[in-house]
Swiss-Prot record:
Gene name as annotated: rplL
Record's protein name: Large ribosomal subunit protein bL12
Organism, as annotated: Rickettsia africae (strain ESF-5)
Family per similarity comment: Belongs to the bacterial ribosomal protein bL12 family.
Organism ancestry: Bacteria, Pseudomonadati, Pseudomonadota, Alphaproteobacteria, Rickettsiales
Keyword Hydrolase among record annotations: no
Top-level taxon of the source organism: Bacteria
């Protein structure tokens, strides 16, 4: 184990140029290429990221701005959230604020449509 620690210490002290030269020497000696595993790893890492985007099923509806028709937006927020008039007004006044969280895509789109029809600016996150 002590030998491995010494090797690790020596490798850590190499400059970038020395490390690149060492890679070339080892590739020639062992008959391998360091480029192929890197490309495979990069392709493998991209696939889970694409799956994560496709798997998003719950959204957060965020009111970013009330717009010119603030009274209409307050009414819609009141209806959507079930809050009282004062609480709905406070929520609209403090935009950007989440209106609904953990909602399905179809429901989030419906809520967004209602708020935008009332004049609000809305984002889905």
């Amino acid at each position: 184990m002590a030998d491995l620690a010494k090797i690790e210490e020596q490798l850590s002290s190499l400059t970038l140029m020395q490390a690149a030269e060492l890679v070339k020497i080892l590739e020639e000696k062992w008959g391998v290429s360091a480029a192929a595993p890197v490309a495979v790893a990069a392709a493998g890492a991209a696939a889970p990221a694409a799956e994560a985007v496709a798997e998003k099923t719950e959204f957060e509806v965020v009111l970013t701005a009330a717009g010119d028709k603030k009274v209409e937006v307050i009414k819609v927020v009141k209806d959507i959230t079930g809050l009282g008039l004062i609480e709905a007004k406070k929520l609209v006044d403090e935009a950007p604020k989440p209106i609904k969280s953990n909602v399905k895509k179809a429901d989030a789109d419906e809520i967004k449509g209602k708020l935008e029809a009332a004049g609000a600016k809305v984002e889905l996150k």
